[in-house]
């Protein structure tokens, strides 16, 4: 069953630009994980310190393995340097309903 993950990470003031490479490098590694179908970060157009998270995993096991991966744990530690003040990330089980565009 497909797992969708969406959320936000609010970084400290002025930290978005400083953290951009960390996010890009991490996404490149995660995209090679088995079961990763989509993994991206986007900086909000109105707030450059707000990061939007979008992920799609083939199944819950793939998402679970991702959470235990050494590079994911290292990313979490590195993220602390950018003073995250709030994080909200949720997962849903889902299936493709229809193509909109």
Segment roles from a protein language model:
Residues 3-10, 40-67:
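Short, well-ordered beta-strand segments in beta-rich or mixed alpha/beta enzyme
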Residues 7-8, 69-70, 95-101:
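Short flexible/disordered coil segments
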Residues 10-19:
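Short, surface-exposed ligand-recognition loops at beta-strand->loop->(often short) alpha-helix junctions
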Residues 25-38, 56-90:
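An amphipathic, aromatic/His-enriched active-site/gating alpha helix that lines ligand/cofactor pockets
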């Amino acid at each position: 069953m497909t797992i969708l993950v969406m959320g936000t990470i609010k970084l400290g003031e002025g930290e978005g630009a400083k953290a951009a490479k960390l996010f890009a490098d991490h996404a490149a590694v995660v995209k090679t994980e088995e079961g990763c179908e989509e993994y991206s970060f986007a900086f909000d157009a109105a707030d450059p310190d707000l990061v939007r998270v979008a992920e799609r995993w083939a199944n819950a096991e793939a998402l679970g393995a991702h959470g235990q991966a050494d590079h994911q744990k290292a990313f979490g530690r590195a993220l602390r340097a950018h003073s995250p003040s709030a994080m909200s990330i949720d997962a849903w089980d889902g299936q493709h309903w229809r193509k909109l565009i």
